Amino acid sequence: GLQIVESVGADIRFLVFNPKDPAAGKLAVRQAVAQLVNRDALVAKVYRGTAEPLYSMVPKGIAGHATSFFDTYGDPDVAKARELLSEAGITAPVKMTFWYTTDRYGSSTATEFAELKRQLEASGLFRITLRSAPWKSFQEGFNKGAYPVFGRGWFPDFPDPDNFVAPFVGPDSVTGTPYLSNEITRELLPSSRKESDRGAVSDQFKRAQDILVKDVRLLPLWQGKLYVAAGEDIGGGERALDPQTVMQMWELYRKTSW
């Protein structure tokens, strides 16, 4: 027989909000989107359980992972989202355009954004227009700041929380939309880089994630999963994969019976 061993991966997907956009630039609008997105439904309908809801930019399996967005927003709640907009004097429905790339992250991306549109519009608080482009022109567009809201994916160069925060914060953010946070770039990141024991930097990165939640410039959606298929006589599959997707073959062994 065959056994399937499942593990969390380090690839993530998230939304980026352009602060220069008339709608996406408003904190209450971003907070309302964060209050409405149903990650469980998203991964169930679109990815059939092969992805996992993500509530921070640092994914599960990486030191410093937290559930900051869930801790702040909890389950999707239309009433709370409506209140956020109302208190900010914003009239619903809010019109926004969401962009995604057609050829970078797989064919399910279009279905994913259709589901995001459905969720937001079902609240009655948003009217979402979807636009897409091939990766080359998509990349040119977000680097010019042309997109109000757009989807990005990320796979780290190395499995460290720094690689899930530093690239997105600062004047040269890889998202093409500068994100200035002096506390993160001048205090938390430099402090964490002095620590060789990466398991000891959780406090700095949890604080960084609290700041990311407060600003809602980035909205994490999901992280991928990894799978190993092996015969039932093979053990160690659960240790053979790490979040960097490096196959650690030495962890595999043939079971013996006595």
Regions found by a protein language model. Name each.
Residues 2-16, 62, 170-187:
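Periplasmic-binding protein-like
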Residues 14, 30, 34, 39-43, ...:
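Extracytoplasmic/secreted envelope proteins and their assembly/folding machinery
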Residues 86-156:
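Ligand/substrate-recognition segments at binding pockets and active sites
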Residues 24, 53-87, 104-111:
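Structural transition elements
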Residues 115, 228-258:
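Long beta-strand-rich cores associated with HINT superfamily self-processing modules
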Residues 28, 43-44, 74, 122, ...:
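Extracytoplasmic/peripheral linker and loop segments enriched in polar/acidic and small residues
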Residues 1-6, 146, 160-175, 231-237:
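Ligand-binding "clamshell"
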Residues 7-32, 45, 189, 224:
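A bilobed periplasmic-binding-protein/Venus flytrap-type ligand-binding module shared by bacterial periplasmic
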